[in-house]
Amino acid sequence: MTTPGEDHAGSFYLPRLEYSTLPMAVDRGVGWKTLRDAGPVVFMNGWYYLTRREDVLAALRNPKVFSSRKALQPPGNPLPVVPLAFDPPEHTRYRRILQPYFSPAALSKALPSLRRHTVAMIDAIAGRGECEAMADLANLFPFQLFLVLYGLPLEDRDRLIGWKDAVIAMSDRPHPTEADVAAARELLEYLTAMVAERRRNPGPDVLSQVQIGEDPLSEIEVLGLSHLLILAGLDTVTAAVGFSLLELARRPQLRAMLRDNPKQIRVFIEEIVRLEPSAPVAPRVTTEPVTVGGMTLPAGSPVRLCMAAVNRDGSDAMSTDELVMDGKVHRHWGFGGGPHRCLGSHLARLELTLLVGEWLNQIPDFELAPDYAPEIRFPSKSFALKNLPLRWS
């Protein structure tokens, strides 16, 4: 089969790269520049990567041609990936049902509870004088706050994280182990039981409310939603916690500025998400022939939209490789764009604002461990630091 763009002499040149060789692990700025410099469309590992701002944004806003369902709903999998793997109008219905629970107004009611958990988690670390911030905080923090909002027992946090880690590791292995399969089965059994229990005995939590509203989700839809949120819905905050603490450890003047002017924490958080989004690309599949970057992709072409490359493309003063702290919140695509823009973006901002503010309150001065060199796990579907050793007196 001929790859589009390479069918005959003199045709459009399609650059080919190997994803795992991109220099992403140490410096995403260099990694995304390598991809942008290769061309507007780059073929890697069976996917067409779109690297130009105008092409990426046009695709994000056009689900009719760039389908999420075809890219994200595994063939033959009876569990619907709600709401991610749906296109309008089905996706529109899911957003309408779910959006009220993740709106600023709804989250403001949960703020006192979320703040208490944030204070307690950092208080448990502050007296140690050191921590490995990814394992001790970043991986735990969004899960704990999610359980509070969603309505799952807090005592199940660690085993849910264990199941999640095993299932994600399984997806990266050519041959799953028996332990991987067992973890996937146990997670599904757990969620099935919790969904059924909340349907029988609903409470004020999100898991209950989406099953009893004016347009309730079916049991299989709620199960698919819960499965997605556990496996992939919390990565943005985990990654951003790590990158936030990394930058603060490096920059004592920035720490002092944010302590003196907490309103600027919001600007800082937006910059972290712009520079280091955990989900740097959005997968899509074309539903009809479409011309992008000078070449025509046929229907059924697997595409990845490089939002992280756009965020750093230098097209304006705010789209650089540097942390821009000018007092303003600037537009970026770290939370995606178009109808599939991150449903939990308001929650992520709230959680990160709470965490950075409370960390600086309890641990105002800290530093990186000697000889530490930050790297992300790469290649990986989600970008986050491998580890982050911090210390303070």
Swiss-Prot record:
<protein>
    <recommendedName>
        <fullName>Cytochrome P450 143</fullName>
        <ecNumber>1.14.-.-</ecNumber>
    </recommendedName>
</protein>
<comment type="similarity">
    <text>Belongs to the cytochrome P450 family.</text>
</comment>
<keyword id="KW-0503">Monooxygenase</keyword>
<feature type="binding site">
    <location>
        <position position="91"/>
    </location>
    <ligand>
        <name>heme b</name>
    </ligand>
</feature>
<feature type="binding site">
    <location>
        <position position="340"/>
    </location>
    <ligand>
        <name>heme b</name>
    </ligand>
</feature>
<keyword id="KW-0349">Heme</keyword>
<feature type="binding site" description="axial binding residue">
    <location>
        <position position="342"/>
    </location>
    <ligand>
        <name>heme b</name>
    </ligand>
</feature>
<dbReference type="InterPro" id="IPR017972">
    <property type="entry name" value="Cyt_P450_CS"/>
</dbReference>
<feature type="modified residue" description="N-acetylthreonine">
    <location>
        <position position="2"/>
    </location>
</feature>
<dbReference type="InterPro" id="IPR002397">
    <property type="entry name" value="Cyt_P450_B"/>
</dbReference>
<dbReference type="GO" id="GO:0020037">
    <property type="term" value="F:heme binding"/>
</dbReference>
<dbReference type="GO" id="GO:0005506">
    <property type="term" value="F:iron ion binding"/>
</dbReference>
<comment type="subunit">
    <text>Interacts with the ferredoxin FdxE with high affinity (Kd=84 nM).</text>
</comment>
<feature type="binding site">
    <location>
        <position position="284"/>
    </location>
    <ligand>
        <name>heme b</name>
    </ligand>
</feature>
<dbReference type="GO" id="GO:0016705">
    <property type="term" value="F:oxidoreductase activity, acting on paired donors, with incorporation or reduction of molecular oxygen"/>
</dbReference>
<keyword id="KW-0479">Metal-binding</keyword>
<keyword id="KW-0007">Acetylation</keyword>
<dbReference type="GO" id="GO:0004497">
    <property type="term" value="F:monooxygenase activity"/>
</dbReference>
<dbReference type="Pfam" id="PF00067">
    <property type="entry name" value="p450"/>
</dbReference>
<dbReference type="InterPro" id="IPR001128">
    <property type="entry name" value="Cyt_P450"/>
</dbReference>
<dbReference type="InterPro" id="IPR036396">
    <property type="entry name" value="Cyt_P450_sf"/>
</dbReference>
<keyword id="KW-0560">Oxidoreductase</keyword>
<keyword id="KW-0408">Iron</keyword>
<comment type="function">
    <text>Cytochrome P450 that accepts electrons from the iron-sulfur ferredoxin FdxE encoded by an adjacent gene.</text>
</comment>
<feature type="binding site">
    <location>
        <position position="95"/>
    </location>
    <ligand>
        <name>heme b</name>
    </ligand>
</feature>
